[in-house]
UniProtKB/Swiss-Prot annotation:
Family: Belongs to the RNase PH family.
Identification of the protein by name: Ribonuclease PH
Molecular function, one GO term: tRNA nucleotidyltransferase activity
This protein's record includes keyword Repeat: no
GO terms (BP aspect): rRNA catabolic process; rRNA processing; tRNA processing
Keyword line: Nucleotidyltransferase, RNA-binding, rRNA processing, Transferase, tRNA processing, tRNA-binding
Enzyme Commission number(s) of this protein: 2.7.7.56
Top class in the EC scheme: transferase
Higher taxonomy: Bacteria, Pseudomonadati, Pseudomonadota, Gammaproteobacteria, Pasteurellales
Function: Phosphorolytic 3'-5' exoribonuclease that plays an important role in tRNA 3'-end maturation. Removes nucleotide residues following the 3'-CCA terminus of tRNAs; can also add nucleotides to the ends of RNA molecules by using nucleoside diphosphates as substrates, but this may not be physiologically important. Probably plays a role in initiation of 16S rRNA degradation (leading to ribosome degradation) during starvation.
Subunit-level organization: Homohexameric ring arranged as a trimer of dimers.
Annotated catalysed reactions: tRNA(n+1) + phosphate = tRNA(n) + a ribonucleoside 5'-diphosphate
Gene3D superfamilies assigned: GHMP Kinase, N-terminal domain
PANTHER family the UniProt entry points to: EXOSOME COMPLEX COMPONENT, EXOSOME COMPLEX COMPONENT RRP41
Amino acid sequence: MRPNNRPVDQTRPVKITRNYTRYAEGSVLVEFGETKVLCNATVEETVPRFLKGQQQGWVTAEYGMLPRATHSRTQREAAKGKQGGRTMEIQRLIARSLRAVVDLKALGERTITVDCDVIQADGGTRTASITGACVALHDAINKLIADGLLKENPMKGLVAAISVGIVDGQAVCDLEYVEDSNAETDMNVVMVEDGRLVEVQGTAEGEPFSHMELLQLLDLAQKGIEQLFEAQRQALNATSDAIR
């Protein structure tokens, strides 16, 4: 039996709150159940040196966890003096996922950085980050259009991500921490709206998984991500504004 008696193909309750903080061009609090991530998108009128003169922009991301985002305090990476390998892997994944839905030429010579800060972690922090960051990026780009800095929308659609896995021999969608820590197979899937895949990260933690199980997990991921796309669309169509 899953936590909260969830069906195997159902995501946790998903909540996306736009305009969560005051200063960022795009700001979203995304919640996958008890996992909560703040995603802030910042626009800078410059590009990395390797793109100077290339007539295109850049989208990148940074990721971090607050010290008490987990059950016990974790030292800030700034205090350690360097980022961990997991952090660098996740922020690169977020950035690649966002670039998959942006026409960098149409963005112009500017950079959008999305900072994803995990407030509370209960599994799926990277997938929640991607899903929330997409909405924050959308809002930042819309501000550029509203301010007359862009003539056309460089965003080609939505991107979202979800975790799937095999727990106690059962394929399940959107794993909570207690499931993730006991999964025989753990997989993260990133997808755009037309069903094409951006990235698949899958690992057998114990028993290897079969080709048939891989296809089953991908089908389960697609069904879960469709639920996330719907949550994104609802948030973007709403007049949600957390700032008063």
